Amino acid sequence: MNAAVMTSSTNFSDYVIADLSLSVWGDKEIRIAETEMPGLMAIREEFAAAQPLKGARITGSIHMTIQTAVLIQTLEALGAKVRWASCNIYSTQDHAAAAIAAAGTPVFAVKGETLDDYWEYTHRIFEWPNDDKGAPVYSNMILDDGGDATLLLHLGTRAEKDASVLNNPGSEEEICLFNSIKKHLAVDATWYSKRLPQILGVTEETTTGVHRLYQMHKEGKLAFPAINVNDSVTKSKFDNLYGCRESLVDGIKRATDVMIAGKVAVIAGYGDVGKGSAQAMRALSAQVWVTEIDPICALQAAMEGYRVVTMDYAAEHGDIFVTCTGNYHVITHDHMAKMKDQAIVCNIGHFDNEIEVAALKQYTWENIKPQVDHIIFPDGKRIILLAEGRLVNLGCGTGHPSYVMSSSFANQTIAQIELYANTKNYPVGVYTLPKHLDEKVARLQLKKLNSQLTTLTDEQANYIGVQKAGPYKPEHYRY
């Protein structure tokens, strides 16, 4: 474990970070980020006096970046208490974690932490100090990215009743997760079932986590209501598309210094993340190829001028490979075995299993620098694997810009307020925020860009059948 428990001058030590001395740097960057996050800061100002999250004890599992620090401080400004961990072993910005710890917020995040560390920290964000009378205190809200915090409580509760659910791990990550659950159950056989019923709800940030929630609900396993933040238009069409359009290339270039112009860039998946990734590569004059399973998305890619191919075909021709599907083994061992010498392979989807990284463990790995590895095949060929197949934009870069994260985190904050304040209105299920709140976030964001919205006249509003103040589109409208 490469983390260290750092103790501050006020004896607050409920955190695990890399280096508390980085907090000054973190604070300076947080102040800059605030100026680029108009939507989130406007919500902080609007609701601060009302304290709508007073009494909320939020377990947060999301990338511990500078932008997330602004989110944490916003939740606290609205009355919440939080405990935080990163949702990815490589995505933490250590100076951001230090700034949050120095301010007295429990945070457990170190860039490059091990998988064992990761699951230990995910447990720690559910472990609150007892109250003044010595009574136990539990989380009552979850703010999740990828669904790991939600998964932990559900799987652990099942394991209390049937330990066999931990018998057959399917990956290195599951081995570490299952071992972590076994360790906690050995100390407290009801650790999970004591905490699960206390959760009022979860707000989920990303596509992969949303898929998990819908599947759990379909199977009757979801224990509390969830708000799907990912499918708010001002999240998915902005964070997923415009955020990836800027952060993908930043991560690749920081890692490799490669010239992108003229190279064949293969984008696996043409959803919102794939669209942004393809735009980024084309903007730097790459030859962009797209792989897709969905004929509609494939047709969109073709109409944008991209060449639509299969990965089987692209493998031996591509120079740069980017997975953004949310699926499993999109790039397999056999694909990588066919790739050119020095081909670059990376992922911008949430989990590392889009690329069959486990199959590469049999070969020699030569570390170039943090999160950049040469994989050396028996014939001497090398491919460059970035962030061990995890999120390249956060593993090798600093993630999305503050401005676009303002939209996402404004939605997260609104969702936390809505679910915490109106829990009785949400039976167990998966929900999205109403369109008028989506439009509110967009209005707040527009102010930063010196934009001017046209106002409908009464006659115009009546003619198209909408309210002058919106919402302007029906729920089924596709932006």
Swiss-Prot record:
Q: Which cofactor does it need?
A: NAD(+)
Coiled coil stretches, renumbered: none
Q: How is the cofactor bound?
A: Binds 1 NAD(+) per subunit.
- One example GO MF annotation: adenosylhomocysteinase activity
Gene Ontology CC: cytosol
Q: Binding positions for substrate?
A: T65, D145, E205, K235, D239
What residues bind NAD(+), as annotated? 206-208, 240, 269-274, 292, 327, 348-350, 393
Catalytic activity annotated for this protein? S-adenosyl-L-homocysteine + H2O = L-homocysteine + adenosine
Determine if NAD is one of this entry's keywords. Answer: yes
Q: Which Pfam families match?
A: AdoHcyase, AdoHcyase_NAD
- EC number(s) for this protein? 3.13.2.1
The biological pathway it contributes to is: Amino-acid biosynthesis; L-homocysteine biosynthesis; L-homocysteine from S-adenosyl-L-homocysteine: step 1/1
- Asked if the Swiss-Prot or TrEMBL record annotates the protein with the keyword NADP, the reply is no
* Compartment(s) of residence: Cytoplasm
Q: Which GO biological process categories is it annotated with?
A: L-homocysteine biosynthetic process; one-carbon metabolic process; S-adenosylmethionine cycle
This protein's UniProt keywords: Cytoplasm, Hydrolase, NAD, One-carbon metabolism
Family that this chain belongs to: Belongs to the adenosylhomocysteinase family.
Summarizing the function annotation, the protein's role is: May play a key role in the regulation of the intracellular concentration of adenosylhomocysteine.
Q: Tell me which PANTHER family the record gives.
A: ADENOSYLHOMOCYSTEINASE
What name does the UniProt record give this protein? Adenosylhomocysteinase
Q: Which organism is it from?
A: Herminiimonas arsenicoxydans
Gene expressing this chain: ahcY
